[in-house]
Amino acid sequence: MKPEEKARIIIDRMLNDAGWEVVDRNHYSPEVSAIAVEEGLLKGNREADYLLFLNGKAVGVLEAKKESVSIYSEIVADQAEKYTRGVPHWCQAWMNPLPLVYLSNGRELLFRDTREVDSEYISLNKIHSPKEIVKLLGLKDDFAGLPTLKRKGLRDCQYEAITKLENSFRSGHDRALMVL
């Protein structure tokens, strides 16, 4: 296994533990409440290692490096911050440029909120949960901090019914009838 792959496995686990569903870009679904898209496409044919979405809107990027690469490098930070300004047109964003930047090599994790121009990267023990990001950014969305519904243990019809119910409420409907 390559060093990059080892770091990705650790980072995937960190994201999952925080409540993010990690998927490759071919399996992105805007219906998932908290999703980290691997190799997220950006403007100019660039790819963010992870593009973070809350309720179908991009909120930040996570730049992953192999364990031997220092994430304290200005080059790594500049690369990730460029990605925050490259949100493609097909993708909605909570803010543009994206406000949150994470850097990780699987061992260490740095974070910066780019809304504060002179802010510095700070070291974190874990990635923010979707609920913590909702509070941090002051997002006004009742569903943005909800955990992602997991398919495991549900029949396809149950998963589909619950997902459609959530989408109905997200769309502003205040009532729904669900029959299983």
Each model region followed by its residue ranges:
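ATP-dependent helicase/translocase motor core
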Residues: 1-180
